Design a protein with these regions (language model features):
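N-terminal Rossmann-like NAD(P)+-binding domain of SDR-like oxidoreductases, especially those catalyzing
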Residues: 1-177
Length: 177
């Protein structure tokens, strides 16, 4: 998607980063938006995060230090016409990411364990509409989703938060617009 491809281009500008991108390449994806043809530090795995064992196998193969979870169905209007794909991708997919990453994290040795982070990229849509333009949202604002898309992302926010609180899993959530 738009944010993910921009992030990958930015991360590749640092010669130390190695990027493993799991993307099912859907309507929101454009492989040509990332110039990675000859870049040996970039690997694209064209799969859905809901594929059984994909996350665990990928993590064991590549042994990353950080996970940035941007995989999502992301258009509000599409969520109104087809909410089931949003539920499956944004809620079940996030659950699968958490399960696979948590299992991997538990297998790490102490040095890698301390360095590992799971970044979940959400949306400001989870906070609903803001009536006063002088106000803003914070991570402590109440969740008030107004569409199936926003509700599916809010559900993901809560799953990620619960893994952090319940299992001390090292999570970070950002709610971008």
């Amino acid at each position: 998607g738009f944010i993910g491809s921009a992030l990958i281009r930015y991360l590749l500008s640092d010669k130390e980063n190695i990027i493993i991108n799991v993307d099912k390449i859907s309507y929101a994806s454009n492989k040509n938006s990332i110039n990675t043809e000859d870049n040996k530090r970039y690997t694209l795995i064209e799969e859905d995060i809901n594929k059984p064992n994909l996350i665990s196998e990928t993590l064991e193969s590549y042994k990353p230090n950080y996970i940035i979870h941007l995989a999502a169905e992301s258009h509000v209007d599409r969520s109104i016409d087809n909410p089931d794909s949003f539920i499956f991708s944004n809620i079940v997919g996030t659950f699968n990411m958490l399960q696979g990453c948590y299992k991997y994290w538990n297998s790490l040795e102490s040095k890698e364990l301390e360095r590992f982070k799971f970044l979940y990229v959400s949306t400001d849509e989870v906070y609903g509409s803001i009536k006063n333009k002088n106000l803003s949202f914070t991570e402590d604002s109440n969740l008030k989703p107004n569409s199936p898309y926003a509700a599916s992302k809010a559900s993901g926010d809560l799953l990620v938060r619960s893994w952090g609180k319940t299992y001390n899993f090292p999570i970070i959530t950002t709610n971008s617009s």
